[in-house]
From Swiss-Prot:
This is Trans-prenyltransferase. It comes from the Viruses. It is an enzyme of class 2 (transferase). It catalyses: isopentenyl diphosphate + dimethylallyl diphosphate = (2E)-geranyl diphosphate + diphosphate; isopentenyl diphosphate + (2E)-geranyl diphosphate = (2E,6E)-farnesyl diphosphate + diphosphate; isopentenyl diphosphate + (2E,6E)-farnesyl diphosphate = (2E,6E,10E)-geranylgeranyl diphosphate + diphosphate; isopentenyl diphosphate + (2E,6E,10E)-geranylgeranyl diphosphate = (2E,6E,10E,14E)-geranylfarnesyl diphosphate + diphosphate. It holds the Pfam family polyprenyl_synt. It is found in: Host endoplasmic reticulum; Host membrane.
Length: 318
C-alpha cells in the first residue's frame, strides 16, 4: 500500500513537471491584440517604398481599430497619423528585414509594433512643434494642424497619448518576440535597453525642440535605425556604428529640409548660414557616409536608393 502511495506521488510529480515544461517560458506584460496587425504581410519579401508604405498604412489602420487610442483622443490622434510619408517606420522595418536575411530566430520577426512606436513618437513631436508656444503653425501636410482643428488642450493630450502608446507598442513587440521567436536571445533585456534608449532619445528631441536645432530631427531616426538593428539581430553589437549611420541620415534629412525652408524659416537654418550649395553638398556627403556604413553591415538594400532620393527631392523642392 505504501509503495502504491509513493508511486502515485511520483506519477503526479512527473505530470506536474511535464505540464510545467510545456508551459510557455515567458509572461506577457501587455494585453494581446484582438486583431492581427500584419495579416497578409510577409516581413521577408523584398519591397519597394510604395509597397512598404501601403503595408504600414494597413498596420496603422488595424492598430487604431484595435483601440490604440481611446475616447476623445481617438479622432485627433488618428487625424495626426494620416497622410505621412512613414519614412521612419519603413526604415525600421527594412533594417529588420535585411538583418533577418542573415539571422534566424526560428520564425520571421514582424516588427509591426516597433514600427508603430517610432511613428507615434515622431507624430507626437510634430503636434508639439506646431503648437502656438513653438512654431504656431496652422497647416501641416496640406491640412489643419492638430491644435488648430481640435484645440490646444486636445493637441497636448494627443501628443502625450501617442508617446505613452509608443512605449506600450515596444512592450508589445517584445511580448510578440517572446511568443513567436524562441531562439531570440534575452528579449526582456533588449526590451529594457530599447525603452531606456528611446527615453534618452525623446529627451534629446525635446531639448532640440526648445532651441529649434537639428537635435529635434535626428533622435527619431536613431530610434528607427537602432530598434531595427536590435530587433533584427538580437544583439547590441555594433550599435555605435548603426547610431552613426542614423546620425548621418538624420543630418542629411534636416539639411534638406533647411534648403526647402530657406526662404520661409525665421529660426535657425543651416542653409541660410552656409548657403544652399554648401548645404546640398553636405546632404550628399552625409548620405554617402550612411550608405557606406549600411553596406559594411550588409543591410544596404535597393529600397535605400528610393529613401535617399526622397531626401534629395526634399532639398531640390521636387
Amino acid at each position: 500500500m505504501l509503495h502504491l502511495i509513493y508511486i502515485s506521488i511520483i506519477v503526479v510529480l512527473i505530470i506536474i513537471l511535464i505540464s510545467y515544461t510545456r508551459k510557455p517560458k515567458y509572461f506577457r506584460i501587455t494585453a494581446p491584440r484582438s486583431v492581427a496587425l500584419f495579416h497578409g504581410i510577409h516581413p521577408l519579401n523584398p519591397k519597394n517604398y510604395k509597397t512598404f508604405s501601403k503595408e504600414f498604412e494597413t498596420i496603422l489602420n488595424n492598430a487604431i481599430e484595435d483601440g490604440d487610442f481611446k475616447g476623445q483622443l481617438t479622432e485627433p490622434c488618428s487625424y495626426a497619423l494620416r497622410g505621412g510619408k512613414y519614412i521612419r517606420p519603413i526604415i525600421l522595418m527594412e533594417i529588420v528585414r535585411a538583418c533577418q536575411l542573415q539571422h534566424s530566430f526560428g520564425a520571421p520577426i514582424y516588427p509591426a509594433e516597433a514600427a508603430l512606436a517610432v511613428e507615434y513618437f515622431h507624430v507626437a513631436s510634430l503636434i508639439i512643434d506646431d503648437m502656438p508656444s513653438f512654431d504656431n503653425d496652422v497647416k501641416r501636410r496640406n491640412k489643419d494642424t492638430v491644435w488648430a482643428r481640435f484645440g490646444v488642450a486636445k493637441a497636448q493630450m494627443s501628443a502625450l497619448a501617442l508617446t505613452m502608446q509608443g512605449f506600450q507598442n515596444i512592450c508589445r513587440q517584445i511580448d510578440w518576440i517572446k511568443e513567436h521567436c524562441p531562439r531570440f536571445p534575452d528579449p526582456n533585456q533588449l526590451g529594457a535597453l530599447l525603452c531606456t534608449f528611446v527615453s534618452h532619445s525623446l529627451n534629446s528631441a525635446g531639448s532640440g525642440q526648445l532651441v529649434d536645432t537639428p537635435e529635434k530631427t535626428i533622435p527619431f531616426f536613431k530610434i528607427a535605425f537602432i530598434m531595427g538593428w536590435v530587433l533584427g539581430t538580437g544583439t547590441i553589437e555594433d550599435i555605435g556604428m548603426i547610431e552613426r549611420a542614423a546620425h548621418c541620415f538624420g543630418h542629411a534629412f534636416q539639411l534638406a529640409d533647411d534648403i526647402k525652408d530657406h526662404d520661409t524659416d525665421t529660426g535657425w537654418n543651416y542653409a541660410k548660414i552656409h548657403g544652399k550649395q554648401k548645404t546640398f553638398d553636405d546632404v550628399a556627403q552625409s548620405l554617402q557616409e550612411c550608405k557606406k556604413i549600411l553596406h559594411g553591415k550588409k543591410i544596404f538594400t535597393s529600397i535605400w536608393n528610393e529613401i535617399f532620393q526622397k531626401v534629395i527631392n526634399v532639398a531640390l523642392g521636387t
